[in-house]
Every structure is written in structure tokens, then in C-alpha cells.
């Protein structure tokens, strides 16, 4: 089997795995079960964002799922405009339904899309966060390029994922992107005693200077 055929086969398997977890019945189960298991992590993310003391600005949640974090941020940090994107149209449908029911439609925006091809202009966001999503990404280089592109100069990227996600994996991908000249910081985040209580947070910051064009 040629290399491109191996890659295509891997992409098909990855898409099949994604569809089984995050579409149809799977999306509804995720909305009920995983959101409860990760609630304390979301509280930690909100606290981290609050510590920045942003009076106003835009925040993107990449891999937002049913939009729980986006809605919580809108309630807790009313000066921010909060956006969420997810590859699953079913998840985005759930997120929008929750926002309507909670009367948050004017405070939040949800889009269906790929983190590797974000539908936002350059330098759109002050902060991009991603929770329990990166380990599902088929590859890391293109998503990192896109996340860099949509960050404003000085903007921050925070990726929270399970403890088993290693910094070396992200470092290797980072070296191939405009983030290459920035330092990857990472730390363990404890949110309780449950099996879903220990996470790893990866932090990158875009340079404050205006960037020259990079391919």
C-alpha cells in the first residue's frame, strides 16, 4: 500500500470513529454524560480566563461540542464575545438549542467547521481555548497554523486535554508552524478525585509584534 493510500485509509477510520462518537445518538449522549464529567475542568478554564482581567475581547472555543463552556463563559464574563466551533453539525445544533433556551443567542456564536480550516478572518481572537478535543484531531500541524492565524498579536492559545497527551507530540508539530519561535508551556491541572480529574494544559502565546507573512 502506497503512503497516500495509507493516509487515506487512516483518515477514513478516523472519520468513522468521529461519526460514532459525535453525531446522532452519540452527540446526545455526550451532551448529557461528558459535560457532567468535565464540569470542574470548565470551571478551571473560566477561572484562568478571568485571571487575565479582559474587560472586552473575543474568545474562541475550538472543538466546543455542545457549547457548554461557551455558554458558561458568556454568563460569567459578560464583557467577552464568545465563539464556538465544532466539526459535528449535530453538536452545533445542540449548542444553538441550548443558547436559545438560555437566552444567550446575542452573546454567543456557534459555527460548524474544521479546526484545520477555520472560517474566521486573521487576528480575530484574543484567546483561543480547546478542551478535551486535541487528542481527536487527525494531525496537529494544520490546526496549529490556523489557530495561530486567527489569534491577535499577543493572543493566547490554551489547550486542555487528558493527562496522557504528551508535550513532545505538540512540540514536534509546533516546530513546523509559526508557533515554532514561541515557548510551549505545560502543566498538570487537578480538578478533583474522579477519573476525569487530572488534565494537562498546554499554553502558547503569539508574538506581540506584527507577523511577517509565513507560508
Where are the language model's segments positioned?
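N-terminal, positively charged/glycine-rich alpha-helical extensions of SAM-dependent methyltransferases
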Residues: 1-28
Amino acid at each position: 500500500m502506497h503512503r497516500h493510500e495509507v493516509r487515506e485509509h487512516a483518515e477514513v477510520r478516523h472519520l468513522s470513529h468521529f461519526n460514532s462518537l459525535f453525531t446522532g445518538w452519540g452527540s446526545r449522549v455526550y451532551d448529557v454524560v461528558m459535560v457532567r464529567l468535565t464540569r470542574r475542568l470548565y470551571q478551571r478554564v473560566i477561572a484562568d480566563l478571568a485571571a487575565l482581567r479582559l474587560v472586552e475581547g473575543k474568545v474562541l472555543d475550538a472543538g466546543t461540542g455542545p457549547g457548554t463552556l461557551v455558554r458558561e463563559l458568556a454568563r460569567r464574563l459578560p464583557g467577552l464575545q464568545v465563539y464556538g466551533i465544532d466539526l459535528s453539525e449535530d453538536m452545533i445544533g445542540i449548542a444553538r438549542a441550548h443558547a436559545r433556551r438560555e437566552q444567550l443567542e446575542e452573546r454567543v456564536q456557534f459555527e460548524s467547521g474544521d479546526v484545520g480550516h477555520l472560517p474566521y478572518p486573521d487576528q480575530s481572537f484574543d484567546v483561543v481555548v480547546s478542551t478535551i478535543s486535541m487528542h481527536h484531531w487527525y494531525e496537529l500541524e494544520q490546526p496549529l497554523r490556523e489557530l495561530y492565524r486567527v489569534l491577535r498579536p499577543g493572543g493566547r492559545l490554551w489547550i486542555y486535554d487528558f493527562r496522557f497527551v504528551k508535550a513532545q507530540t505538540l512540540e514536534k508539530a509546533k516546530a513546523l508552524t509559526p508557533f515554532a519561535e514561541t515557548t510551549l508551556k505545560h502543566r498538570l491541572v487537578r480538578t478533583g478525585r474522579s477519573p476525569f480529574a487530572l488534565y494537562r494544559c498546554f499554553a502558547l502565546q503569539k508574538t506581540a509584534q506584527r507577523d511577517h507573512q509565513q507560508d
